[in-house]
Amino acid sequence: MLGAGGRHLAVGRAGRAGVGRRHPAARAARHHRQRQRHGVHLERGPGLGDDTGVGWHYIAPGKPQQNGFNESFNGRLRDELLNETLFRSLPPLAPCGGVATRLQRAASALEARVADAAGLCRSAHRTQRPACCVVDGCADRPLANPADHSSDQPRTLVMAG
């Protein structure tokens, strides 16, 4: 079987691809060293790189594509962990990452000038309580309005066939 660069590879008994008999040991060792990762690009400093002994350097200014894999991983992790669960209020969310602490920091950063948004909304809509006046949390509203049985989409004719 031909591997990268036309090199011959053989599959051993354990099912792993290894260097075949046509390669001398020196070429096999050099090939292995060339394929190893010698360093990583880091955005904010050494982090875990110092502990593992892997060489590192900062991402070059103006080269955001070097951080693309990290951002992709972070987005997928966020989708799997946070966006999968609907929280009805903030207390169940608190163990997920210190939300209360972040909210307190945000309020102190604004010098406690955070307005009561639900109260302002209720005073603006005195006759009835519309869907924008959610007090409990972000997932209190139903996904489909039970009072509205109409569709936004025009009806399509099904062809008889």
UniProtKB/Swiss-Prot annotation:
Record keyword Repeat present: no
GO term, biological process aspect, one: DNA integration
MF term (GO), any: nucleic acid binding
Compositional bias of kind Basic residues: 19-39
InterPro entries, sorted: Integrase_cat-core (IPR001584), RNaseH-like_sf (IPR012337), RNaseH_sf (IPR036397)
Keyword Nucleotidyltransferase: no
Biased composition range(s): Low complexity: 7-16
The entry's keywords: Transposable element
Pfam families hit by this protein: rve_3
Annotated region (Disordered), positions in chain: 1-47
Record's protein name: Insertion element ISR1 uncharacterized 17 kDa protein A2
